[in-house]
Amino acid sequence: DVVGALPKALYKGDYDVRVILPNYTCIPWEYRGKFRYLNHFYMDYGQRSENMFVGIMQYEYEGITFYFIDNEYYFKCDKPYTDSIRWDIERYIFFCKAVLAAMPVIGFHPDIIHCHDWQTGMIPVFLRSTFASHSFYWGTKSIMTIHNLKFQGVWDIKHFLYNTNLPRYMFTPDKLEFKKDANMLKGGLVYADYITTVSETYAEEIKTPYYGEQLDGLLCARSRSLRGILNGIDYTVYNPETDPKISVHYTVKDAVEKKKEAKRALQRNWD
């Protein structure tokens, strides 16, 4: 919802907002069938001897340009996430590096790369390490947004070393190491220029041991770069006056009674 609605809101403010996603084969064909091929290249990935294919597909939707990183080995799937966190970590490390490698090919130099949750956590890491010497990326900043702190992308350091080809000194407690393993979200929180989360209240809560999911110390250390921004919704989609997915429409004037009717209709559908 956020990646769908936020770009539309920013676009109205005359910002050039673009979105990059994996080209999951489980994306409905009504959309995938309209993707157009833009370009492709081969990218070194981790400590492998052969380079990996990276395709770039493009799609325009409601004024926003979407790019899709294509690689069937990683993104041919029935659902975005699998039952293997080890495999998903390998897939998303690939995605993170491919996103940065694709930008010069696309010809788009963003001022800010906005990353969401652990699946994109390696983008700020790569931006400040592997890609730091490339002049194309100079001046580009990164923001890491936490939607759900519980999920962090944690696996053993050896797996991360093989798939990132980063130096061993980056896997220390002040960087990517987390209880002798490696942590993708932690990497993003350490290396991002700024951190946001879904509300001001949650931004304060995650700095405490109870809500901090063992990252509260890091979040306290970065508190000057941490801000809560309340989630909004797209009123053109979630509008009870016009939403075709609810049985009873209502406005603020009759919401109390009509919402009860809508709830009863929903319950009848599940009887």
Regions found by a protein language model. Name each.
Residues D1-D271:
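Catalytic cores of nucleotide-sugar-dependent glycosyltransferases that transfer UDP/GDP/TDP-activated
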